[in-house]
Amino acid sequence: MNSERSERIKIPVLPLRDVVVYPHMVIPLFVGRKKSIHCIETSMNNDKKIMLIAQKEASKDEPSTNDLFNIGTISSILQMLKLPDGTVKVLVEGLQRACIKNIESNGEHLVAEVELIISPTVIDKEQEVLIRTTVNQFESYIKLNKKIPSEILNTLSQTKNAEKLADTIAAHMPLKLADKQSVLEIYNVNERLEFLMAIMETEIDLLKVEKRIRNRVKKQMEKSQREYYLNEQIKAIQKELGDMDEIPDENKILKRKIKSLKMPKEAKEKTESELQKLKMMSPMSAEATVVRSYIDWMIQVPWNIKTKIKKDIQEAKKILDIDHFGLEKVKERILEYLAVQSRTNKVKGPILCLIGPPGVGKTSLGKSIAKSTGRKYVRMALGGIRDEAEIRGHRRTYIGSMPGKLMQKMVKAKVKNPLFLLDEIDKMSCDIRVDPASALLEVLDPEQNINFNDHYLEVDYDLSDVMFVATSNSMNIPAPLLDRMEIIRLSGYTENEKLNIAKCYLYPKQMERNALKRNELIITDCAIISIIQYYTREAGVRSLEREISKICRKVVKLLILNKSLKKIEINSKNLKKFLGIKRFDYGKTNNLNQIGQVVGLAWTEVGGELLTIETACVSGKGKLTYTGSLGEVMQESIQAALTVVRSQAKKLGIKKDFHEKHDIHVHVPEGATPKDGPSAGIAMCTAIVSSLTKNPVKSNIAMTGEITLQGRVLTIGGLKEKLLAAHRGGVKTVLIPYENKRNLEEIPKNIIEGLTIYPVKNIEEVLKIALENTPYV
């Protein structure tokens, strides 16, 4: 800071709050503090000179010497006026910067010894450029900030005094106290101008943004006002023409609709209340749109509309038989359910949950139940739903809020008593943060769903007339939800059932879908059986339908390319041309009896599966290894099986210390697929015994059963699915736990007839049947 300092003078000090006075600046001040008034009176009685200096904190009424800045402005009092309330109004003019060297109080006011600051007057080309640039920038600022009078710009554009220019601009800028004081403390005028230019640049940018926002708001307001004005003009013109009666008031239409709906009292009061709000709002406001949307939803909800329910059980049976082949037990249970409903005239009762592998007809069964009862069919896919709001709706405070999917589907159905299918209920996403399954508890509980409350509608809705049916691939459903439903299991189809389904449903459906005439394509029974055996291996019929669809597409292409072709017959011999090489070896689980290899039977969400188990025994130190993505339960089964073998080593002719001198490796192929469960226990034990004794396992045998340490065989689940898997895989002999013998009565005869089934009580019986040679010595 280059400046010249003169001699020191003593002068009264007037502290200012949030005000910085610059040289060349004339400003009125209102003074109310007792010491400040005394300070002004002292100055008026002398040479009218006073030191004006800003307080660091405006909140302090009695500032000390440390509460004041060091640099201030010596000013002259031009005029003083005492006001009736005891305060004083003074008009002061800033003269020169000064620096406080010493300050003290004389008891009545502050007195300071100050040193005048004289900036060097050097005019060069740089300063001239700075003056011109600063004036131009200030002009841009004034154009955006209308609060500053344009006369000031006229005055400044003619001045050549850089000091006066800088201080005048600073006086008119809306600066913070710290920035105002910084301008005062910059002695070098060029630096002061640069500092002000930087501040003005920032202010100009802010003012431009402010102007853009203001213009946007103004345009929006003008648009709304224009639309309102035009609407009023149209109404006035229509009134003059006498057409106003033909255009009824929208609010009156809504009121009439609400009155005609026979809503429950709570819903009616809520809707009428919202309608009153709507009347008070501008039609163009955003809130009016939200309220109008809510009223529309309330009007669309089927509060009291019902379809007439059919009670003819014979007709229901006929519809189920036409739409679905087989599934006799399932149909019987559904008819029992419908019979009870027809007698009681109430829907209250257990919610049906159809559980089975993909493609067995769960969803289509729901459609058939709706058709047989005369109910409207509504389907809600729950797969992937992870938010409770998707079921219960969003509260209206959220932008774009809507009722939940449940109420949306009810609006779509337009009746209060549809059949509501909750599809894939086991596929809902649940974690520690979200649990949409909990929202379904109220829906599926007959005692609670009378008062279902959607967050958007905010009123109770009666779901007791709705017939809910759920579908799932597995029992992996939260326990409270499962407790509210009655389980009906749909197992996979047999080969004969698949053949009939293909002939009666899939083949005609794909013929129609691919625009084929009845005589253009013939698929023989042998061809369909070959597709089932060699191109699909599933519990349902989806893959079978895909293969038939593939044949139809290829036939359509051939008929178009070769006009001379009129008819194509697909049989087991030419099937390869249409579907390619065989994907599965039906009836060839193992061609030869092998050591250490056993076929187990497993149950999965997609039905039963054949599970190959391999065991190898090599010299080592007694290490047990298991591979193939095995779960904890299956690993424990292997350990239990090994303990059983050790306990019966003497009977089996195995050396007592085999577990110390041999490493045993158990592997279940298809290592990328996770596997778990206890039902492979006897298969593991058989594989280990076969490997240790070098006694081959019969190739046409499959087995299932949990093993205990005493060698007993415990009951298992999913027997029908497992026997179906054995049937599909061409297995001839199956070993099952003796306690599962009673379940054979529920399994269709056409499955059992193709299999030789041995119920076994212990591992001794298993080994005698499964191994090629008698294992016991």
Curated annotation (Swiss-Prot):
SUPFAM superfamilies: P-loop containing nucleoside triphosphate hydrolases (SSF52540), PUA domain-like (SSF88697), Ribosomal protein S5 domain 2-like (SSF54211)
One record GO biological process: protein quality control for misfolded or incompletely synthesized proteins
This enzyme's EC code(s): 3.4.21.53
Pfam assignment, any one: LON_substr_bdg
Keywords: ATP-binding, Cytoplasm, Hydrolase, Nucleotide-binding, Protease, Serine protease, Stress response
Name of the protein: Lon protease
GO-annotated molecular function: ATP binding; ATP hydrolysis activity; ATP-dependent peptidase activity; sequence-specific DNA binding; serine-type endopeptidase activity
Active-site residues (renumbered): S679, K722
Species of origin: Buchnera aphidicola subsp. Schizaphis graminum (strain Sg)
Xref: CDD domains: RecA-like_Lon
Positions with a binding annotation for ATP: G356, P357, P358, G359, V360, G361, K362, T363
